[in-house]
């Protein structure tokens, strides 16, 4: 349905449609600055699009928008507050639709739609008798893959052979929030520690065997 909404052909296998969707999104990201984004055109409300065009803040490709907006902040490039405000709003539209909304939809397709369910939370999910792996950052793809691997008997055996009771994947900060929205807890995907503020306490617990950082929001400290 998401591919169809963007005007991507849904004929063929699931893998073929997925590749076509990725190609479409990538092409839109790299669209020229003065070439309107097809993603924004497809997803934004009609009345908003009309206003954005009137204000000249309907964005092109997000990569060009980022370069245009950030370079405008350089000395003697654009010091007029109204112009900078409009560029910030234009970049905001691009980020909301081409980055955040598309990213969430794609994660929903891959891992399921978020639904309410029970989840173990806080530092009590960390048990020193287990090998505790914490994916940390903003992109849950690594974390989901770790859960899939940890559920396989061979990876559990590696932990027990080393003297632990087993291997657990513990969700953490933004990556963890994406994970716990979509997948229910079990003996392997055990729970959620908390948000960014708890990161030092999590590491100070001495229960973390692997702090798997996918990108930002990972403190540059040595446990």
Language-model features: where?
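Metallocofactor- and cofactor-centric catalytic cores in central/energy metabolism, strongly enriched
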Residues: 1-223
């Amino acid at each position: 349905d998401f591919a169809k909404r963007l005007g991507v052909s849904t004929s063929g296998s699931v893998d073929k449609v997925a590749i076509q969707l990725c190609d479409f999104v990538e092409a839109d990201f790299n669209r020229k600055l003065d070439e309107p984004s097809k993603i924004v055109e497809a997803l934004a409300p009609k009345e908003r699009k009309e206003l954005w065009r009137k204000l000249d803040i309907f964005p092109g490709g997000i990569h060009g928008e980022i370069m245009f907006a950030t370079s405008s902040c350089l000395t003697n490039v654009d010091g007029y507050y109204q112009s900078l405000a409009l560029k910030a709003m234009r970049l905001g539209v691009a980020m909301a639709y081409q980055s955040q909304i598309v990213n969430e939809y794609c994660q929903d397709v891959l891992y399921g739609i978020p639904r309410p369910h029970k989840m173990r939370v806080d530092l009590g999910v960390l048990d020193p008798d287990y090998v505790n792996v914490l994916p940390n950052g903003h992109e849950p793809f690594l974390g989901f893959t770790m859960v899939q691997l940890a559920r396989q008997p061979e990876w559990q055996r590696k932990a027990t052979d080393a003297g632990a009771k087993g291997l657990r994947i513990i969700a953490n900060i933004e990556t963890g929030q994406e994970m716990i929205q979509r997948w229910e807890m079990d003996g392997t995907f055990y729970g959620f520690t908390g948000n960014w503020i708890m990161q030092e306490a999590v590491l100070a617990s001495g229960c973390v065997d692997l702090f798997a950082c996918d990108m930002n929001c990972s403190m540059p400290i040595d446990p």
